[in-house]
Amino acid sequence: MINFPTGMYEWSMLASQLTAEKTIRFQRFLRRFRLAYCFDGMKLHFLDQNTIDGYDALFSVFLSYSSYELLLSSISTYYDDASIKEDRTKYSILNPGIAERLKRDAKLEEFLHLEDKNHPLTQQVDRFFNSNDADILPLLEAIKDKVKHGFFSIGGMKPDSKEHSKDIWDGSRELLVMTEDIFHNFVLCES
């Protein structure tokens, strides 16, 4: 089906056997995935195009990452295993090109800096910017957290270039592909 993740037929067979609580969680994921998949930017007036591109990239990450989180939470509920939604270390998005370009963006690094140095996400973001690690998933999570907690101000982060906004946008699209793969593999295993 268009703009739904691969595996919808298998999902419909599986859903007919689930409790309402478990089905509702997956339905939330499917609606968020569809929104993230269909998101093509915002229509904003009186702002320059670089600012609009930055907002579009940040909001795309928010939608894609929250879709990913909803899927992990749904699978966690399905198996009655809370560790599934908490253990995100088994997934990664390796993209050396995007990683290398974004590591050069000092404004992005400053924007993503968290006050709590002991927070696991702070350590992941620091590791991303200070190593050869090409996994952009922790970076996307940090962006999602900043948007979610009200730091949704492109003025505070304004990417160094249009290319960086595009890289952030492309990272969010890669996250959607990974999320779709996780969903598809899940329904294939369970149906």
Feature names for model-found ranges:
Residues M1-L58:
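Charged alpha-helical initiation segments
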Residues G41-D48, S76, F152-P159:
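Short, flexible helix-adjacent loops and helix caps
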Residues L72, V147-K148:
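Hydrophobic side chains within alpha-helical segments
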Residues Q17, E21-I24, Q49-L63, Y68, ...:
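Conserved aromatic-histidine-acidic binding/catalytic patches
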Residues A134-V147, I154-S191:
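Amphipathic, Lys/Arg-enriched alpha-helical patches that create a basic surface
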Residues L30-A36, D53-Y78, L176:
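Short, hydrophobic, well-ordered secondary-structure elements
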Residues Y79-D135, A142-I143, G150:
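Flexible secondary-structure boundary motifs
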Residues E69, F151-F152:
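Short, flexible loop/turn elements at secondary-structure junctions
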